[in-house]
Amino acid sequence: MAKPAYKVADISLAEFGRKEIVLAENEMPGLMACRQKYGPLKILKGARIAGCLHMTIQTAVLIETLIELGAEVQWSSCNIFSTQDHAAAAMAKAGVPVYAWKGETDEEYMWCIRQTLIFPDGKPLNMILDDGGDLTNLVHAEHPELLKEIRGLSEETTTGVHNLYKMFREGRLGMPAINVNDSVTKSKFDNLYGCRESLLDGIKRATDVMIAGKVCVVAGYGDVGKGCAQALRGSGGRVLITEIDPINALQAAMEGYEVTTMEEASKEAQIFVTTTGCTDIIMGEHFLNMKDDSIVCNIGHFDCEINVTWLQENAVEKVNIKPQVDRYRLANGNHIILLAEGRLVNLGCAMGHSSFVMSNSFTNQVLAQIELWTNREQYAIGVHVLPKKLDEEVAALHLDKLGVKLTKLSARQAEYLNLPAEGPYKPEHYRY
């Protein structure tokens, strides 16, 4: 049986999606510069890219950039709640085989990913663009015969990168991979500034809660946690941090946050945000400690940070307030308000990150795909990062939009610093 040309929630939303894509393009200068620079060269001609990344308006601009560069593209979303149905419809209407809709079941989610493996002409994928590792894991586990044709993969997020390093250590990685997440222009921008705005958008749309004056817990103080803590503090919240890493804990303390354990924080706070990418962060004993109508949400990639299963099995009652907002009544009489079923709150309850910051991340994705497609022989099987020079190029492409005037090194200054006047300006180990 032939697979469908696409599967989306409502193709009639395509016109609405196209209007928003036009707006987003103006906010994504990095991707538009890639089209201008590489489009005429069709530098990705012959690439058959299977993408598994949140099917949003911003992702639509990424998809059409890859196509403009000569690639064939098929797409699924990497989260059951993150698809923006008008974006998916616009891509389907434009002829892109896209398999994504908001509110997929877990079974439908895996079905969607499987549809992207074989292209309409019967040929398999030869490139992967992933977010979280589900597509990568599926190919390795179920279709190892496809690995020999795949030139490489680029991975978007922290969770997926951890998965890649684990696969490589265990000898299971079958292709070169570029870790896009650890490009400075991704992790220090998308993870921090993106979450700083989109977290509050998700919480506010879901609950209309006043942040000011409330005690808020942020679990984890990496780049995502830093952005979330800044957002909550900026709205007047009193922010507590939980951490396992003494360096991150010290950073948080010296920014003026109280650093404590979830056992202690769960007795005091009213809003909980997990950002760790780890499992078992908020457990049954923590729910039992919480105040009535505590709000609990996650902004890490997978839904394993909050023990939703415990809530489902132990709550006396569950009331769905509206899509992705559930109120659980516990045996002690208190209620827990869970957002997006413990999945990404900024995409489940709002629209995700803004276009401008996603232009940083997605420009890195485009450059990673170009690197792997055109210079495959330079990349052994393993996990790689983009060169510093490309990282700086991504940043430079976004300066004009913000009216930034960059100082230029003189020849004497460049000689004094022993740097090329045109960069790169920092060593690979520099942390920013």
Swiss-Prot record:
This is Adenosylhomocysteinase. It catalyses: S-adenosyl-L-homocysteine + H2O = L-homocysteine + adenosine. One of its GO terms (molecular function) is adenosylhomocysteinase activity. CDD domains: SAHH. The gene is Ahcy13. One of its GO terms (biological process) is one-carbon metabolic process. Belongs to the adenosylhomocysteinase family. PROSITE patterns: ADOHCYASE_1, ADOHCYASE_2. InterPro entries: Adenosylhomocyst_ase-like_sf, Adenosylhomocysteinase-like, Ado_hCys_hydrolase_NAD-bd, NAD(P)-bd_dom_sf, S-Ado-L-homoCys_hydrolase_CS. Pfam families: AdoHcyase, AdoHcyase_NAD. Its EC number is 3.13.2.1. Pathway: Amino-acid biosynthesis; L-homocysteine biosynthesis; L-homocysteine from S-adenosyl-L-homocysteine: step 1/1. Its cofactor is NAD(+). NAD(+) binds at residues 157-159, 191, 222-227, 243, 299-301, 346. It is an enzyme of class 3 (hydrolase). Adenosylhomocysteine is a competitive inhibitor of S-adenosyl-L-methionine-dependent methyl transferase reactions; therefore adenosylhomocysteinase may play a key role in the control of methylations via regulation of the intracellular concentration of adenosylhomocysteine. Keywords: Hydrolase, NAD, One-carbon metabolism. It comes from Anopheles gambiae. It comes from the Eukaryota. GO terms for cellular component: cytosol. Binds 1 NAD(+) per subunit.
